[in-house]
């Protein structure tokens, strides 16, 4: 019976830590860049876009496709960085847990 109570206590502690880490992740601000910094996308930890910076030199009618590609690339860069930071924070939390390889938390 003590084992079950101890396990329940650990589960509650883990839930509390998980909530804290999720809040930390949500508060992250991640910048993705493309075109050598000509385009910058800013995402929060949830992957929501919070900002976009475009160098004025890209505002040329004949370079619209280039600008579109750079925006997509900068967004992808920011998203990948955010996912990596989130995985790093979660790895610290789940260290020692027998989770299957490649399993992403939170679910």
UniProtKB/Swiss-Prot annotation:
Compositionally skewed regions (Pro residues) per UniProt: 98-107
- Annotated GO CC locations: bacterial nucleoid; cytosol
Which residues, if any, are the signal sequence? none
Molecular function terms in GO for this entry? DNA binding
Which parts of the sequence are annotated with region: Disordered? 81-107
**Pfam families, per the entry:** YbaB_DNA_bd
Q: What does this protein do?
A: Binds to DNA and alters its conformation. May be involved in regulation of gene expression, nucleoid organization and DNA protection.
Q: What is its main location?
A: cytoplasm
Which stretches are annotated as coiled coil?
none
Q: Where in the cell is it found?
A: Cytoplasm, Nucleoid
Is Ribonucleoprotein one of the keywords?
A: no
Keyword tRNA-binding present in the record's keywords: the answer is: no
- State whether it acts alone or in a complex, and with which partners, per the record: Homodimer.
- State the name under which the record lists this protein: Nucleoid-associated protein Atu0095
**What family, per the record?**
Belongs to the YbaB/EbfC family.
Q: Which UniProt keywords apply?
A: Cytoplasm, DNA-binding
